[in-house]
Amino acid sequence: QKMVQGSKYRFDFATTPGVVKEVIDKIMTEYRQGKHLEKRPRILVTGCPIGGDSLKVIRAIEDNGGVVVAIENCSGVRTLGNPVEEDCEDIYEAIARKYLSTGCSIMTPNDNRIDLIGEIIDEYHVDGVVEMILTGCHATGAESVYIRKFVTEEKHLPYIAVDTDYSTADQGPVSYTHLRAHETLSDL
């Protein structure tokens, strides 16, 4: 949770790498000292941006026995792929190519997002996928049909979509009803 929020909403972007390095150093020190999590289902969280009270989805996963190993969303790893070609003859075309190839749910067809999710599942040895759909994000809600099909039929993993918002009003239902029932957390 601290890692998710630790690098966002900073006005001094120059300090962000230092903050992230501190977190990495702390984690690596604890790892070398033998501090490890017990085996838990490894969960990929995908969908809408996470921050503020929407972190309840991550808390619910981890409070119910899972561990979030990757986040693929509008403000996460999705935006890091396909860097802008700096030596391109037309920099505007290079910028357009970068943003048009981002696997965002408003793009169609959106094979890039499916490919990225597949890569994350393989690289992080994911046991299940939780898609967070914010109320009003109709593009992510509509695309969740394709994500569910890919995850369950091609990757043969459990998938659940959690409809929520940035409030705390549904924290109980998100935690107990949705995620406790998710077969990844209850059966693995």
Language-model regions, residue ranges each:
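A charged, amphipathic alpha-helical module
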Residues: Q1-V68, E72-L80
